[in-house]
């Protein structure tokens, strides 16, 4: 056998080994993302109250506040049940916003107010309040929305985290790229997510906080969103009254919200 043969043989062996390692890494990344998703939201229809407050950098008192009543119909496929991802967002506070409703069906989003004749499509990236966009108040399933790659391990506060790179699977997804930090030990609790634009500019950072036992798992009941582009102003999303609730499917339709969802 000549040297050229050995060269080709080692090249093939290296390529095969690399492919196996990459597949193994991606499978591990997928499992981490899946476990973290289970912490962020249950795989059953549920309802919660979301209080959003807006702060200037360094401030301790909010300058703006909004309260939303949200029903989520998110389910991964199990047995004869198909996957579903819909939500109903009712505006509660301030009083001037009562009667306004947002409806999402996978990655489509509509807004309705009694002044409109019919629901109108809106962007998930459109600002709702402070650093919070329309899409932020609706739980995103990272496993379905992004391809994930495990980049390694890093320190996060006093703990060790997996660092994962997420790249959106479709242009329908709000954020093209996310760097996601998930605790290595325990249930793989989410720690932080950094959201990037198409040209790799860091837009905002999300910190998961105040973990409490809710619906069978320890879940983050507070999320702080910091706008790194505009002086580190930040907004806080606080979750309360989280409970399982399965509304009829027709509640998650444009026809229903036009009649005034309850």
Describe each region flagged by the PLM:
Residues 48-82:
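N-terminal, post-signal-peptide region of Sec/Tat-exported proteins
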Residues 23-45, 51-52, 60-64, 95-176, ...:
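Flexible, processing/modification-adjacent segments and terminal tails
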Residues 12-21:
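Hydrophobic h-region of N-terminal signal peptides that target proteins for export
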Residues 2-12:
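Sec-dependent signal peptide recognition
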Residues 70-103:
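Functional cores of ribonucleases/endoribonucleases
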Residues 36-37, 69-78, 208-213:
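Extended lipid/amphipathic-ligand handling interfaces
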Residues 37-46, 80-82, 213-217:
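Edge/loop elements at the starts and ends of beta-strands within beta-rich repeat scaffolds
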Residues 108, 118-122, 137, 159-254:
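Gly/Pro-enriched, hydrophobic low-complexity segments
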């Amino acid at each position: 056998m000549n040297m050229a043969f050995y060269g080709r043989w080692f090249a093939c062996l290296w390529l095969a080994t690399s492919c196996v390692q990459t597949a193994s890494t991606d499978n591990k990344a997928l499992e981490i993302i899946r476990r973290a998703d289970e912490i962020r939201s249950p795989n059953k229809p549920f309802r919660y109250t979301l209080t959003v407050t807006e702060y200037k950098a360094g401030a301790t008192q909010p300058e703006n506040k909004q309260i939303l009543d949200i029903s989520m119909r998110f389910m991964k496929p199990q047995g004869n049940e198909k996957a579903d991802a819909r939500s109903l967002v009712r505006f509660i506070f301030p009083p001037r916003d009562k009667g306004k409703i947002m409806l999402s069906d996978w990655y489509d989003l509509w807004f309705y107010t009694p002044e409109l004749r019919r629901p109108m499509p809106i962007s998930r990236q459109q600002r709702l309040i402070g650093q919070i966009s329309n899409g932020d108040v609706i739980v995103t399933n990272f496993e379905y929305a992004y391809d994930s790659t495990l980049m390694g391990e890093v320190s996060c506060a006093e703990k060790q985290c997996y660092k994962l790179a997420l790249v959106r699977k479709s242009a329908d997804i709000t954020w093209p790229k996310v760097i996601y930090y998930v605790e290595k030990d325990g249930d793989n609790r989410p720690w932080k997510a950094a959201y990037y634009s198409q040209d790799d500019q860091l837009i905002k950072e999300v910190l998961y906080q105040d973990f409490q036992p809710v619906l069978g798992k320890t879940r983050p009941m507070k999320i702080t969103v910091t706008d790194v582009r505009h002086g580190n102003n930040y907004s806080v999303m606080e979750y309360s009254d989280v409970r399982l609730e399965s509304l009829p499917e027709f509640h998650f339709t444009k026809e229903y919200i036009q009649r005034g969802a309850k």
